[in-house]
Amino acid sequence: MTVIKDGWHGDTSKMFLVGKCAPHNQRLVQITQECLYKGIEAVKPGAYLGDIGNAIQKHAEKNYYSVVEDYCGHGIGKIYHEEPQILHYGKPGTGIQLKEGMCFTIEPMINQGTKYCKTLNDGWTVETKDGRNSAQWEHTIAVTKTGSETVSYTHLTLPTMIRV
């Protein structure tokens, strides 16, 4: 979901479990959310983009999942998609160094199987190449003087996982 307020863009997404879900799918959704928060925890002035990606990748792989490399987070502000690209994998201490005032999305896509995806003939729909499930969570993050602020949070944030 995106919001434009006074010319500034925001971007966020959540996963919702609908109906009765297998425990392995519930776990995928939970670990993906944890990957998002691991990435957010790495955000602070002086850190690097690679620190964010590494935190996400380590948590995903520790839980036997893979990180989609074909899609990434992005800078956001007066323009919806802008530089830098925020990879959800990487090596610590690499990439652009974070500075106070930067704003970007972190939106890891985590797969049960391999990291590979394919785009269907409609040019829009994407699925995993191996047919296994994938999950995604996203928040818009601002780098602050002392760390970060998740600007897509509100006091109205919905519970972590809702079963409809």
Regions found by a protein language model. Name each.
Residues 153-160:
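Conserved small/polar residues in nucleotide/adenosyl-binding loops
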Residues 43-84, 96-102, 112-117, 145-146:
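Active-site cores enriched in adjacent His and Asp/Glu residues with nearby glycine-rich loops
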Residues 146-153:
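Short, well-ordered strand-loop elements centered on a beta-strand within folded domains, enriched
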Residues 132:
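Metal-cofactor-dependent catalytic cores
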Residues 89-93:
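Short alpha-helix capping/helix-loop boundary micro-motifs
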Residues 9, 74, 81, 139, ...:
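Histidine-centered active-site/metal-ligand motif
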Residues 1-40, 103-127, 135-145:
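Short, acidic (Asp/Glu-rich) active-site segment that either coordinates a divalent metal cofactor
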